[in-house]
Regions:
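Extended hydrophobic/aromatic segments used for targeting, binding, or gating
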Residues: 50-54, 59-67, 76, 96-98, ...
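Surface-exposed intrinsically disordered loops and tails
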Residues: 45-46, 62-91, 120-135, 142, ...
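Short acidic/histidine-rich active-site segments
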Residues: 24, 109-114, 159-181
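Histidine/acidic residue-rich metal-binding segments in metalloenzymes
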Residues: 1-21, 27-53, 65-78, 88-105, ...
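Mid-to-C-terminal alpha-helical segments outside catalytic/metal-binding sites
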Residues: 159-163, 179-234
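Outer-membrane beta-barrel pore domains
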Residues: 116-119, 135-139, 172-182, 196, ...
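Active-site environment of divalent metal-dependent phosphoester hydrolases
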Residues: 25-34, 59-62, 114-117, 172-174
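Aromatic-lined glycan-binding groove of carbohydrate-active enzymes
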Residues: 90-129
């Protein structure tokens, strides 16, 4: 721990060129909790607002605090077929999001279906023979926006959109989203997301534990146009 803290201090020094900010992506919830406490004591309390970064992630909706994430059984969450979002502790909880927002940091949404969606939801969508390719793409976009809206809902302010971007992880993801397998499809994704915001609908799936009404979606846009939100994300 002592050596790790010294390395962090060296990376965040201002006297040897630009700072190298720390990416919290692969930290456990316990590590994140310790890291935030260290940053607060060593920097924030000394009027040095070091921004926090999570380069690529999804969000959980059930465990709201880091302590709850630390205590939860990740294996049970992976086996819970009612999860619409990916509720594993590798993803951010509300406490993470609020701390990152307080730091004026940034969160990138990962484009890996096994990080932004529940264990069973993608298979159900894919195996629905009544869903054509256009509707399937819209269902993928709904999963993406479920993560984004959940984070904005946590911040509960238009400033929540300034916190977010696409953090694709194309160089390391395992299960890409169909229709958007590589960076070459980013313009397609951008257009599909824009179309959803221009004509949004409830985000839900029968038998799953997450839903977002059309009224709530419109509220969480905070008066921003679809085009403005997409520009912020991309």
């Amino acid at each position: 721990k002592g050596m790790g803290e010294e390395v962090i201090k060296l990376l965040l020094k201002k006297t040897n060129g630009p700072r190298i900010l720390i990416d919290i992506k692969h930290m456990s919830p316990k590590c994140r909790k310790d890291f935030y406490a260290f940053i607060k004591i060593e920097y924030w309390n000394k009027n040095d607002r070091v921004p926090l970064i999570c380069s690529h992630t999804g969000v959980v909706s059930k465990s709201r605090s880091l302590d709850a994430l630390i205590q939860q059984d990740d294996d049970n969450e992976l086996l819970d077929d009612s999860n619409y979002l990916h509720e594993n502790s590798i993803n951010l909880c509300a406490e993470d999001i609020l701390i990152i927002a307080e730091s004026n940091g940034i969160i990138g949404l990962q484009l890996d279906e096994k990080r932004i969606a529940g264990n069973n939801i993608i298979d159900i969508i894919k195996n629905n023979e009544e869903v054509d390719s256009t509707e399937l793409r819209r269902q993928y976009v709904k999963v993406i926006f479920a993560n984004l809206f959940e984070m904005v809902k946590t911040v509960n302010s238009v400033s929540g959109w300034d916190l977010l971007c696409i953090g694709s992880d194309y160089d390391g993801l395992v299960n890409h989203l169909d229709f958007y397998p590589t960076s070459a499809e980013m313009p397609v994704l951008r257009n599909d997301m824009l179309e959803f915001l221009q004509d949004p609908e409830e985000i839900s799936q029968p038998g799953f534990n997450y839903s977002l009404s059309l009224i709530e979606i419109r509220r969480l846009m905070f008066g921003l146009t679809a085009e403005t939100i997409i520009e912020k994300l991309f």
